[in-house]
Structures are given as C-alpha cells and as structure tokens.
C-alpha cells in the first residue's frame, strides 16, 4: 500500500541556452503591425469537409445540413492563414501553429479567437499560423478514431509545408511551437 508512504523524487530542470533576443521588447510586447496571408494551400486530401465556423453552432443543423457529405469523401484543399510581423528585420523567427477545436466536427482556422491569438503573437515577432484540417466522421468508434488520426496527419503536413517554405516566411526551424484548443490540442500533442 503506497498511499501512506512518502516517495522521494528529484526533479532535474531542463536547461537550454537562453532564447536570444535581438531587442528587449521582442516576444514580450506588441511591437509589430501584422500582415495576414489567407487561404494558403498546404495539401490536397480526401475527406468529408474542412470548415464549419463554430461561432454560431447548432449541432442538429450541422448534422442535418451535412449528412450527404457522409456518403462519399471528396478531394479537399487544406488551407492555412499565415500571420507575419511587418517590417521585421530578423531572417529567422520562431513559428507558432494553432489548430482549432470543435470535436473534429466543426471549427475554422479564421474564427475570432484564432485570429486574435495569431495577430497577438505575430505582433510580438513570431510567425503565426492557423490551419484547417479534415473534419467529420461516420457515427462509429473506428471512424471517430480515424478522424483524429487524419487531423494529426494534416497538422504534420502543414508543418512540413512550413518547414519547406522556411526561407520564404523566415522561419527558425529550431523554434517550432504547436498548440490548439479541444480537438486542436489533442492534435497538437500528436
């Protein structure tokens, strides 16, 4: 019975060279205006759908209006919005990629919270990206699991695309960060 025993342990802090700042406000304060590039295609895939903005969701209507989409997958263009700090002189900047939530069923890269997050981080000096990914699933456990796996594949494809375009967007590939909400956070952890 371990419930009454004290278990000593030691934490070893992860030590990394300090993040080098070119000026004292970068990454701390909003110092840049932001350029937004919308609907950058990063892949083509087969799936049910990509985007149902979740700011006015009525799940019953989503199911009713999209049930024909469950019959057959179609080719979809995976897109992302890219937010860049304007007039930034650094040749390499850290990247933050956000993945929206919505239970792998609804959501969109351009909903207000993701626009605000991306604008904020780009104004600090990061390259920031919000992606769309395949959504929708037939009502069975295997299909739901497959949808989560496909979202992960799509996020990996987005990151591969960004790394391949690192010179264009001036991305520091040693500093790549991924986050999300709900289904997006599940995807980000994979």
Outline where the language-model segments fall:
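Alpha/beta-hydrolase active-site loop signature
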Residues: 103, 135-137
């Amino acid at each position: 019975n371990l419930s009454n025993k004290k278990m000593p342990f030691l934490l070893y802090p992860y030590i990394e060279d300090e993040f080098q700042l070119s000026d004292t406000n970068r990454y701390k304060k909003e110092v840049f205006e932001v350029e937004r590039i919308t609907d950058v295609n990063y892949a083509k895939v087969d799936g049910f759908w990509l985007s149902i903005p979740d700011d006015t969701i009525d799940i019953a209507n989503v199911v009713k209006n999209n049930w024909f989409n469950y019959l057959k997958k179609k080719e979809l263009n995976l897109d992302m919005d890219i937010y860049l700090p304007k007039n930034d002189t650094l040749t390499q900047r850290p990247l933050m990629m956000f993945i929206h939530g919505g239970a792998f069923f609804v959501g969109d890269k351009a909903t207000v919270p993701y626009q605000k997050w991306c604008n904020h981080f780009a104004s600090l000096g990061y390259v920031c990206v919000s992606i769309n990914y395949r959504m929708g699933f037939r009502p069975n456990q295997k299909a739901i699991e497959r949808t989560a796996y496909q979202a992960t594949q799509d996020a990996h494809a987005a990151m591969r695309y960004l790394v391949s375009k690192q010179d264009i967007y001036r991305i520091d590939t040693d500093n790549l960060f991924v986050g999300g909400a709900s289904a997006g956070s599940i995807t980000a952890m994979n």
